């Protein structure tokens, strides 16, 4: 091969290699650009259309590393869409209730820094349950705990921890409140927090950690709310609030809130005469609440809330085994489903019940006169038949030698049904135990079960003689 042929051959090979390298670089550049722009797109499974990621709440930020010829490209995988809760599954069929949680706050206060609280409740987001309570701005072993029997002071705040975690010094103070309610709409928490002067209180509506709306007292007489969870269906949450006399006519209103903004207010209608401290649960597509009549009835009022047209109806639980305290002996107590029974209506205590076909599950103190002991049972026909008194599946939660207090319901969505759970406030200190100057509580929590269960008693358990004065 002569020199000219060698030059031509070498040149041809070099040109071929250069062309191949150029094509590879173009391919790498095209891949890089494509992946960069697809980083901000998701495939919608319903319509196979490309949707932007930006409006979607990010639960996880996953990064996938792709290696191409020593070139590293980072690609963000779009997360699943977070949806509002609708609670459309049926209610679980249960045989009774099984123990779920107990925080032992008072026992732990004997040797640790635990908040003084009252008015506890439980509520769950789609993945986890939390316990709430209204703190008194002090721990128990602290001179500020003197006088914490009082309900409304400016230092009270709403506390929030994972269920089962006592309210220690690291507990988050969600808002300023001496009355509250909380619920999760599937995307974020809503907290309704009431504080201020008795004659001119303010309710703040905090959504996703931001104050979105507020409303002032409308009757200038202790604006107050549920002291248990509110309920959200398809992005709209509802909460029951009362302003007015605690032992006479008051003004109850049902508020509808969308992402923290009040979108509608409905007045109470129906036959209920007095409403306080409702325990509400989803009954798709609506919401149902069992409340406290602090004026005329020891039978509990019922509020039915239509989430579509904002209409309200109210009545009373039909069961002749009534749920409030104080109350008449079971042999002489009554309820006609529509009206207060005018039997020891004042004062009362927060409680709960829920319908199960024609029957009703309910909880109440064992004592008919004071907040001691706690029991649950089902009343056959208790939701549909006036003065029904056939009791089955009774369980003792706290024996009658120990103090109880408020109780309320919360709902948990399972794979196939919605379970009903309840908590019991276990009050210690004043007014019943005058050796100490404080008033506080722990809680015990039970949930519905379709299985079998045993017996027991789950009181607070603290020896008052071991406690700080």
Swiss-Prot record:
Residues 1-6 are intravirion. Residues 325-349 are annotated as: Disordered. InterPro entries: Glyco_hydro_34 (IPR001860), Sialidase_Influenza_A/B (IPR033654), Sialidase_sf (IPR036278). GO terms for biological process: carbohydrate metabolic process; viral budding from plasma membrane. Coiled coil: none annotated. The active site is at residues 151, 406. Its EC number is 3.2.1.18. Residues 36-88 are annotated as: Hypervariable stalk region. Residues 11-33 are annotated as: Involved in apical transport and lipid raft association. Homotetramer. HAMAP family: INFV_NRAM (MF_04071). This is Neuraminidase. It comes from Influenza A virus (strain A/Leningrad/134/1957 H2N2). The gene is NA.
């Amino acid at each position: 091969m002569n020199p000219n042929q060698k030059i031509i051959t070498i040149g041809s090979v070099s040109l071929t290699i250069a062309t191949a390298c150029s094509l590879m670089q173009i391919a790498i550049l095209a891949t890089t650009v494509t992946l960069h722009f697809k980083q901000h797109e998701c495939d919608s499974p319903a319509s196979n259309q490309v949707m932007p990621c930006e409006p979607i709440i990010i639960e996880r930020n996953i990064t996938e590393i792709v290696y191409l010829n020593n070139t590293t490209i980072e690609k963000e995988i779009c997360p699943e869409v977070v949806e509002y809760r609708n609670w459309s599954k049926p209610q679980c069929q249960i045989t009774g209730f099984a123990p779920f949680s107990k925080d032992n706050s008072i026992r732990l206060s004997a040797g640790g820094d635990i908040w003084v609280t009252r008015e506890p409740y439980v509520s769950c987001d789609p993945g986890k349950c939390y316990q709430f309570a209204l703190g008194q701005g002090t721990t128990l072993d602290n001179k500020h705990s003197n006088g914490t029997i009082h309900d409304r002071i400016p230092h009270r705040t709403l506390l929030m921890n994972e269920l089962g975690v006592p309210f220690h010094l690291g507990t988050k103070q969600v808002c300023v409140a001496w009355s509250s309610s909380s619920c999760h709409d599937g995307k974020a928490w809503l907290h309704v927090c009431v504080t201020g002067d008795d004659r001119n209180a303010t309710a703040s509506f905090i959504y996703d950690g931001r104050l979105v709306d507020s409303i002032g007292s409308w009757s200038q007489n202790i604006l107050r709310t549920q002291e248990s969870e509110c309920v959200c269906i398809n992005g709209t949450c509802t909460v029951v609030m009362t302003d007015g006399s605690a032992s006479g006519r008051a003004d109850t209103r049902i508020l509808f809130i969308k992402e923290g903004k009040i979108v509608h207010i409905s007045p109470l209608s129906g036959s209920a005469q007095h409403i306080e401290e409702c325990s509400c649960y989803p009954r798709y597509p609506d919401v149902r609440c069992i409340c406290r009549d602090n004026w005329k009835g020891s039978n509990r009022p019922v509020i039915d809330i239509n989430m579509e047209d904002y209409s309200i109806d109210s009545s009373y639980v039909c069961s002749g085994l009534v749920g409030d305290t104080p109350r008449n002996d079971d042999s002489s107590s009554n309820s006609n489903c529509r009206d207060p029974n005018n039997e020891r209506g004042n004062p009362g205590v927060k409680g709960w019940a829920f319908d199960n076909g024609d029957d009703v599950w309910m909880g109440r103190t064992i004592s008919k006169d004071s907040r001691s002991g706690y029991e649950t049972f089902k009343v056959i026909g208790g939701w549909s038949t006036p003065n029904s008194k056939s009791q089955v599946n009774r369980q003792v939660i706290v024996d009658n030698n120990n103090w109880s207090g408020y109780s309320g319901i919360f709902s948990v969505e399972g794979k196939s049904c919605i379970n009903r759970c309840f908590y019991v406030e276990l009050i210690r200190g004043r007014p019943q135990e005058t050796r100490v100057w404080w008033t506080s509580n722990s809680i015990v929590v039970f949930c519905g079960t379709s299985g079998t269960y045993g017996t027991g008693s789950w009181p607070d358990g603290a020896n008052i003689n071991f406690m700080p004065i």
